[in-house]
């Protein structure tokens, strides 16, 4: 399973969970961040609860909740690639993240300037 986990200040970390002792040892050997505790809900939680006899692995990337997070997706793919050694190219997602983040910053700046202008006009009207 691949999921995002809300983080107020994402640092690009990906946490991994498994119910298999053998897989846990492999994850540790590869330097993966092992999930110590978390609140997991939805289909992933259901799968985890029902997987008593089936080994599972979950990758949980820190994300900015509420906006598409290409950077978190790239970090999740990077972690999966590190674990499986598939040589997946995650760089296009990082490029897309840069483009999206730049557009988002420009939009926020534009909205901020519009709000300041609106406030200035309101003060001019009352003052």
Identify the role of each PLM range.
Residues 6-127:
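Accessory terminal and edge-of-domain segments that mediate assembly/interaction
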Residues 1:
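A glycine-rich, hydrophobic loop/mini-helix early in the fold
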């Amino acid at each position: 399973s691949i999921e995002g986990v809300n983080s107020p200040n994402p640092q690009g970390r990906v946490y991994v969970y498994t119910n298999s002792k053998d897989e846990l040892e492999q994850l540790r050997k590869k330097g993966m961040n092992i999930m110590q505790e978390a609140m997991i809900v939805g289909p992933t939680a259901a799968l985890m609860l029902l997987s008593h006899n089936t080994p599972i692995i979950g990758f949980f990337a820190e994300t900015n909740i509420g906006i598409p997070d290409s950077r978190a997706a790239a970090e999740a793919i990077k972690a999966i690639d590190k674990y499986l050694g598939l040589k997946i190219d995650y760089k296009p997602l990082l490029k897309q993240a840069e483009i999206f983040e730049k557009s988002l910053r420009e939009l926020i700046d534009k909205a901020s300037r519009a709000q300041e202008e609106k406030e200035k006009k309101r003060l001019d009207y009352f003052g």
